[in-house]
């Protein structure tokens, strides 16, 4: 039963993420990769497709540790996307844009919910090592550093206010990096703990 639910959930996620990706390519082109939200959703699409492959094609029908770790990264990243959109960006720029228009319901709500629920309660495969808890932090900081550098050399602008190096005080940038890194670690630790309890 769990395997069937996992397959159904990730099939839905894959379809939703493909729809969102097509729209994002049309809307942003190559610039879409500067968005943490879009990167997180692309990762989830790849993770879900990988899980489907493992469960439908491979004889053992289990998910390898590296793929479960990637799912942890996408689940945490999508949660951060939801929280930042809901608590920081939407109050500044409008709720409708971040949660109701175009593919925003997928990127900011449906994908995060399905990703987290499937990671917590539908995990199949070997247990994650304890050090996996740092994977979402590492991935998020890597994204932040890369986009910050691209802002510094004026290749991209933003896309988030705390990445605009020429408009934001260094202390504000450091503060937001710290807040998001801690948030990623806390979410990751909670998710790993709940997943172990439901294994």
Positions of predicted regions on the chain:
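Membrane-interface transmembrane-helix boundary segments in multi-pass integral membrane proteins
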Residues: 154-190
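Juxtamembrane "helix-exit" motif on the non-cytosolic side of transmembrane helices
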Residues: 22-30, 86-96, 152-153
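N-terminal membrane topogenic signal
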Residues: 1-12, 198
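Alpha-helical transmembrane segments in multipass membrane proteins, preferentially the mid-helix core
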Residues: 112-129
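Membrane-interface capping segments at transmembrane-helix boundaries
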Residues: 57, 189-199
């Amino acid at each position: 039963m769990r395997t069937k639910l996992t397959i159904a959930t990730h099939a839905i996620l894959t379809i939703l993420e493909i729809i969102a990706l097509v729209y994002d390519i049309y809307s942003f082109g190559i610039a879409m990769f500067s968005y943490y939200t879009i990167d997180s959703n692309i990762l989830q699409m790849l993770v879900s497709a990988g899980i489907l492959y493992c469960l439908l094609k491979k004889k053992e029908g289990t998910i390898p540790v590296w793929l479960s770790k990637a799912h942890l990264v996408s689940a945490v990243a999508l949660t951060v996307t939801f929280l930042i959109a809901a608590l920081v960006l939407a109050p500044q720029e409008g709720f409708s844009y971040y949660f109701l228009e175009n593919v925003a319901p997928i990127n900011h709500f449906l994908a995060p919910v399905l990703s987290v629920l499937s990671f917590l309660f539908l995990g199949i495969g070997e247990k994650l090592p304890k050090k996996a808890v740092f994977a979402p932090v590492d991935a998020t900081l890597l994204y932040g550093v890369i986009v910050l550098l691209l802002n510094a050399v004026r290749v991209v602008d933003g896309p988030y206010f705390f990445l605009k190096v020429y408009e934001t005080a260094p202390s504000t940038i450091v503060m937001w990096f710290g807040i998001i890194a801690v948030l990623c670690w806390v979410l990751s630790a909670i998710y790993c703990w709940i997943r172990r309890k439901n294994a």
